[in-house]
């Protein structure tokens, strides 16, 4: 494939280190310079710089956010300066590149269509996907992929994610993370994923989550969120996602949190309680107290003396049509043995 992430990353970090070492003994860099260095290292941009993604051979869609980490920081060419990446064919455009070709099996990337087609035909992940199966239903399979074992795969996945999550910054310390990737059962094409920090002092059960554009509006986000809480439940911890959430992430979480709270209060363990505390709700749902409070406010179901109005919950359920299908995850398909 045309680009090696490790080469691009090394080129970027070495240039940053060179600038820092070259300034040793001089005045400290200004806040503006520090900001520029941060943008170079994490690829943070205020506007889109790649117009569209060719994802596999037959999927094409626009990017949502810009990212500089695909490019040499000085030439703005794809990869490091010694490669022959092409600038955007659109002159005087905001875009550094018109089309980025991304393998839908392994997320390796190039700006050369011929090389891309050749890679896709022989990509090993087309025939053997990485990771270990942790959930397998007739519809969907979730695999755990360790960043320490599949470093390049996970780095390329994180790079791709930066084009669709505005708060996704880290992409190179993947050995500290596990990635839970969802596939259609029987397929080798990833549809989305969430990552989990292995050394989270806040005991977060999710670092970031993304369903890839071609597979959105299928309920896969709710499936992965529910799975992340199932992992926490098996670990015996009250947990939740890393904050801040992206705007789309917050929408997904509020829907899941609303469903789980409604179920426990209307049909579940707390249905016959005259009074419940925030701690009760936290224990039975696995949600953090702050997330419980946020969701109850979102449901607009808190009345005088902090009473919970069940009619408000039933109204929400009627509006969203979720009462007949409370959960997407089925325990009988879990394969969690470690």
UniProtKB/Swiss-Prot annotation:
GO terms for molecular function: acetyltransferase activity; histone acetyltransferase activity; histone H4K16 acetyltransferase activity; zinc ion binding. The gene is SAS2. It comes from Saccharomyces cerevisiae (strain ATCC 204508 / S288c) (Baker's yeast). Its EC number is 2.3.1.48. This is Histone acetyltransferase SAS2. Residues 1-31 are annotated as: Disordered. Keywords: Acetylation, Acyltransferase, Chromatin regulator, Cytoplasm, Metal-binding, Nucleus, Repressor, Transcription, Transcription regulation, Transferase, Zinc, Zinc-finger. A zinc finger (C2HC MYST-type) spans 100-126. It catalyses: L-lysyl-[protein] + acetyl-CoA = N(6)-acetyl-L-lysyl-[protein] + CoA + H(+).
């Amino acid at each position: 494939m045309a680009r090696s992430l490790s080469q691009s990353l090394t080129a970027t970090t070495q240039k940053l280190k060179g600038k820092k070492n070259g300034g040793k003994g001089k005045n400290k860099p200004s806040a503006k310079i520090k900001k520029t260095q941060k943008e170079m290292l994490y690829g943070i941009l205020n506007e889109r710089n790649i117009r569209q993604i060719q994802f596999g051979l037959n999927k094409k869609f626009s990017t949502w956010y810009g990212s500089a980490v695909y490019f040499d920081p000085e030439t703005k060419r794809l990869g490091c300066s010694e490669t022959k990446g092409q600038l955007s064919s659109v002159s005087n455009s905001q875009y550094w590149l018109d089309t980025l070709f991304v393998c839908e099996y392994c997320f390796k990337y190039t700006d050369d269509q011929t090389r891309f087609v050749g890679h896709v035909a022989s990509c090993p992940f087309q025939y053997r996907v990485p990771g270990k199966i942790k959930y397998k239903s007739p519809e969907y399979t979730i695999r755990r992929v360790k960043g320490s074992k599949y470093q390049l795969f996970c780095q390329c996945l994180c790079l791709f994610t930066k084009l669709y999550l505005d708060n996704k910054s880290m992409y190179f310390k993947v050995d500290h993370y596990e990635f839970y990737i969802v596939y259609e059962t029987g397929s080798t094409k990833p549809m989305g994923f969430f990552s989990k920090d292995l050394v989270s002092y806040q005991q977060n059960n999710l670092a970031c989550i993304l369903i890839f554009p071609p597979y959105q509006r299928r309920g896969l986000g709710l499936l992965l969120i529910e799975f992340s809480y199932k992992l926490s439940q098996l670990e015996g911890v009250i947990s939740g996602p890393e904050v801040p959430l992206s705007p789309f992430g917050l929408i997904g979480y509020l829907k899941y949190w609303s469903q789980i709270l409604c179920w426990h209060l209307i049909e579940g363990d707390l249905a016959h309680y005259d009074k419940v505390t925030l701690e009760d709700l936290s224990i039975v749902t696995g949600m953090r107290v702050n997330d419980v409070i946020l969701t109850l406010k979102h449901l607009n179901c808190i009345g005088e003396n902090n009473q919970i109005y069940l009619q408000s919950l039933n109204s929400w359920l009627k509006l969203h049509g979720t009462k007949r299908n409370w959960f997407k995850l089925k325990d009988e398909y879990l394969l969690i043995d470690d």
